[in-house]
Amino acid sequence: DLCGREVVASLNSSHIDTELAKETLKIALERRKPAKGIILHSDQGRQFTAKEFNKFCDKNYVQQSMSKAGCPYDNAVMERFYNTLKHEFYYLYKFDSNDILDQKLYEFDYGKYNHVRPHRANGGLTPYAARCRAA
């Protein structure tokens, strides 16, 4: 969520594909129940440009916005999140199974990242606190 940098939906998979993108967006929409016309900004990955994903967005009143090809600065907030995820989580641990990885990823995203880790962009507030303040 761009407002407070909060992770709204996060899924792990060995394949980045349209089904993963749709399922993740479905979870986000169920959790937040946003107004029609909410903007989903992404890169131009195949999973986001697929007709199936475009139809899913249209059906759910999600307006797609995409960064220019080869320009990660257009999607800087997500790029920063993935950098944080790698350096504060993924590179620090060894996971014995995908189930353990999924569990620990859930704890990091929805626990530490959203409720414990402050962000400069939020004036030192956690993503959760920033969302509560904005509401």
Short names for language-model regions:
Residues 34-49, 68, 123-127:
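Acidic/histidine-rich, metal-coordinating catalytic segments
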Residues 10-34:
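Active-site beta-loop-alpha junctions of metal-dependent nucleic acid enzymes
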Residues 58-62, 84-135:
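C-terminal domain-tail junction helix/linker
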Residues 5-6:
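Residue-level signal for well-ordered, solvent-exposed loop/turn and beta-edge residues enriched
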Residues 1-2:
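Short, acidic, Ser/Thr-enriched surface-loop or helix-capping motifs
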Residues 40-44, 58-77, 94-97:
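RNase H-like polynucleotidyl transferase catalytic core
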